[in-house]
Amino acid sequence: MQSLTPSSGVNLKSIIRKTSLPPGQTRFITGRVIKCGYQVDSANTVNTAGAPASYNSGHVGASRADWQSSCAILASKVVSQQPDTEKTGGAGNITAVNGHKTLDLVSIDNLPKALTITDLSPAPMHGSTLRVAYQGVPGAYSEAAAGKAYPNCEAIPCDQFEVAFQAVELWIADRAVLPVENSLGGSIHRNYDLLLRHRLHIVGEVQLPVHHCLLALPGVRKEYLTRVISHPQALAQCELTITKLGLNVAREAVDDTAGAAEYIAANNLRDTAAVASARAAELYGLQILAEGIQDDSSNVTRFVMLAREPIIPRMDRPFKTSIVFAHEGTGVLFKVLSAFAFRNISLTKIESRPHRNRPIRLVDDANVGTAKHFEYMFYVDFDASMADVRAQNALAEVQEFTSFLRVLGSYPMDMTPCCPSRDE
């Protein structure tokens, strides 16, 4: 897989430089803190017929004038500005560690800073370089997924999943690449909830093999470690291997894997290791104590690519469609599944999430009295394009006995083999 190389930071006031990039190079941006009171209403629309004919595949901004006007109004809600707090440590004179007189660490201040929810303000018109938002800091697996999905993109780090959604909605980014499930850890529930709350469309997917490494400051040996920090899922995916390495360490959870590596480098922590990628070690000046420490070599994370507008469904290649629906009454879920089964459409995923607007449903029964049931939203992926008549008829039938139905996207399937290769 093509590696990403960050360049120097760019002021968020100018957002993006209108310069072209040579093939294979990815550029990052940084920003000042801008507080913006923007919120997104829940999307309760029903879209079962795929993308309208006016939508252009791969094209963003069919209603750009309206978006720019809306963004200008939102920008007027800016209430304050404050400069980024300077970070210290990580690049100065450091006490010797196991014979090493100095540590040649990357200056944290020279790396791109993740956008926060207060940084969001409308971006000006931009050039042809595609800007892709992801959650985390440089070196995160989401950054690698963004580079795999859009090799020549300009990657924009965001500190939260919701910030990545809003970055696309406010034209700061053209796309967002966010994880939705892992082959070992399961679904990323937060992003399923955000898919329903925001009005973005799934336009593609990418599957990324995950190869964890144990990282520490140069000169630090494994027997000197007292704790290991990383994202909770990363720690869980490496639990057996960490034990086999003979490490008597405490496990502590942080927001993301690359953020753990950045934290160790910035604070010169000699008793702490991070579970992160090899790229994170390179970026933050850490050494790799052990490679491939995931318990299962077939560790794969699935990411979805999000845009403001859907793409036109096609029939010339395998497509996948994602929907979400709510139901009322008995036997509705069986009827929904039957609508696909009768048309020989394979379901690849079904996920239930609590219905936030109606968490509990009361059912009065003359025999047993009043019963309380949890209400759920169901997320379903199936192998068919919305251009397929079978899919159109299936959703038309589903809509008849569901109280809510929304098509999240119909998009090409990622057909690349997910072979666990450390060189990827």
UniProtKB/Swiss-Prot annotation:
InterPro entries per record: ACT-like_dom_sf, ACT_dom, Preph_deHydtase, Preph_deHydtase_CS
Subcellular locations according to the entry: Plastid, Chloroplast stroma
Gene Ontology terms: cellular component: chloroplast; chloroplast stroma
EC number: 4.2.1.91
Keyword DNA damage: no
Domain ACT positions: 321-412
Enzyme's top EC category: lyase
Catalytic activity entry: L-arogenate + H(+) = L-phenylalanine + CO2 + H2O
Induction of synthesis: Circadian-regulation with peak levels occurring at the end of the light period in flowers. Triggered by EOBI in flowers.
Main location group: plastid
Swiss-Prot/TrEMBL GO biological process terms: circadian rhythm; L-phenylalanine biosynthetic process
Transit peptide: 1-52
Distribution of this protein across tissues and organs: Mostly expressed in flowers, especially in petals (corollas and tubes), and, at low levels, in roots, stems, leaves, pistils, stamens, ovaries and sepals.
KW Endoplasmic reticulum (keyword) present: no
Recorded metabolic or biological pathway in which this protein acts: Amino-acid biosynthesis; L-phenylalanine biosynthesis; L-phenylalanine from L-arogenate: step 1/1
Every Prephenate dehydratase domain range: 131-308
Key words, A-Z: Amino-acid biosynthesis, Aromatic amino acid biosynthesis, Chloroplast, Lyase, Phenylalanine biosynthesis, Plastid, Transit peptide
GO MF entry, a single one: arogenate dehydratase activity
Disrupted-gene phenotype: Reduced arogenate dehydratase activity leading to lower levels of phenylalanine (Phe) and downstream phenylpropanoid/benzenoid volatiles. Petals accumulate unaltered arogenate levels but decreased shikimate and tryptophan (Trp) levels associated with the down-regulation of carbon flux toward shikimic acid.
Stated role: Converts L-arogenate produced from the shikimate-chorismate pathway into phenylalanine (Phe). Involved in floral volatile benzenoids and phenylpropanoids (FVBP) production.
Comment field (misc): Has no detectable prehenate dehydratase activity.
Protein known as: Arogenate dehydratase 1
Protein species of origin: Petunia hybrida
Lineage: Eukaryota, Viridiplantae, Streptophyta, Embryophyta, Tracheophyta
